[in-house]
Amino acid sequence: MIRLGKLTDYGLVLMSQIAKRDASELHTARDLAAGCQLPLPTVSKLLKVLLHQGLLASHRGTKGGYSLAREPHLISLAEIIAAMEGPLALTECSLESGSLCDLEASCAIRDNQRIINQVVRGALESVMLSDLIRPLQLIAIRDAKGNVVTTTSTASGRMQ
């Protein structure tokens, strides 16, 4: 089963919490912990990772806190997941930096694995943080061959 780690899930919740509020508002770790109903040490750890990965900005001072480094519509789900988990790859041979797989030379499905990885990555890159804070609707449509294809539509009507 492909599953995001718990900290990645919490990172998505945290980023969504920040994105829901006014862009000029700064958020303290304590306020975010309360808003997300997560332990303060967990939120502090998440903030450190997301800040280090360039998704958050830190503002010092008595009225300091954290804000998004970019507008929510410019931060993809893929970026957040990669910040928390590392490079997006379903298998070792899907890593862009090279494979650690012992079967690489004889693998019959390596090329297909890479294509599947690209499709999954593309789907995650198409969902933006701004989409996470609005309800998504699953829509079934037919392609040119008549096959049912599912897609999503945001509350604003943008198809993905």
Describe each region flagged by the PLM.
Residues 72-97, 109-119:
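Conserved segment of winged-helix/HTH DNA-binding domains
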Residues 2-6, 12-38, 57, 67:
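N-terminal helix-turn-helix DNA-binding core of bacterial DNA-binding proteins
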Residues 34, 51-52:
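Alpha-helical residues within the helix-turn-helix
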Residues 95-160:
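C-terminal regulatory/oligomerization modules of transcriptional regulators
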Residues 53-69:
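Beta-hairpin "wing" of winged helix-turn-helix
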Residues 41:
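Key DNA-contact positions within bacterial/archaeal DNA-binding proteins
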